[in-house]
Amino acid sequence: LASGRVRRTLIGLTSIIKNKKTDLREMIFSLPYYRESDQLPGPLPEQHEIDHAVRSLPTIRNPDYGGHLVVIRDLYVVKYGPYVAENEGYALLFIEQKLSIPAPRLYAMYRNEDKLYIVMQYIPGITLGHIWPSLPENNKTVLLGELRSIFADMRSLPSPGFYGSVTQGPVPHRYFFSREGNPAITGPFTKEEDFSKAIALRSRQIWSDRGRHGWTSDFLARHLPSALSGHQPTFTHGDLYRENILVKKVKNSTSGVEEYRIAAIIDWETAGWYPSYWEYGYIFPLFQWDDDWPESVESILDPWPLEAALLRFVQEDLEF
């Protein structure tokens, strides 16, 4: 960060973080955001440190679109790029204020030229996907129990009465993208029926861009609103890959044996308020079915098999 830059905190955030009873509607979000210096583990990264960082982290997305991830002084992770979404930073602030789950703290978020920079807490660990195949069953059981508790806490938050981002903005997921910013596609939505209709509209937009009639869009428009109904807005991570779960080794206090425990859930880019089936239903079409992970997810989340089957059809329509 350039020396002498005027630091403005996210309006109202300091009091929000200190007041756990603050209603979501009182949270005001704007950029730039810098956490107070006495709440930082060290000086915030300078621009030259970010530009010349030698340690980067792997990402499941193309860095040109999902952003670059670099580690600074083993204190900070900086995610940056022209397509990095502000929603991730706002979600981390929301989590800190509303929940007690392992997730990175947000230390700064700002724009520099055409790039968004999200400066987060560095949490050491390795991804669950890296070690899962070699884990003994008893350690898998421990980890799944921890994850069940984390996601139960998230899902227990009272419904805010809308489907959208934590800032009460558009649904932060590519299935609800509209170049024109059409609110019938992007949301936010107060009715699940409109949430489902938006998926059909997005499908129609994609097929129209290809110069073809969307017959599947017609099917989705006819059936999604009635087939996907009765699901309350639920706080959702939205990307439950094993690569988004960090674990660390700790010594079992009873046996003295080292085992893996949950260190953090990361990558909150698409987090927000979705129908209660979405956490399970969205990840279901992405299962590889080459090990026990799909079955294990049912120990973390209650399964929604019918809704998941429909979302598999949606995924094939929107992404292929």
Task: Enumerate the predicted regions with their spans.
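ATP-binding pocket architecture of kinase catalytic cores
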Residues: 49, 53-189, 232
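Conserved phosphate-coordination/catalytic loops
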Residues: 60, 83-86, 214, 291, ...
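An alpha-helical support segment within catalytic cores of ATP-dependent transferases
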Residues: 44-45, 140, 153-238, 248-260
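Active-site Asp-x-Gly
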Residues: 192, 230-235, 248-316
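Conserved protein-kinase catalytic-loop position immediately C-terminal to the HRD catalytic Asp
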Residues: 243-244
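Juxta-kinase regulatory segment immediately upstream of eukaryotic protein kinase catalytic domains
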Residues: 1-59
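Charged phosphate-binding loop/patch that engages nucleotide di/tri-phosphates or the phosphate backbone
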Residues: 9-16, 22-23, 32, 299, ...
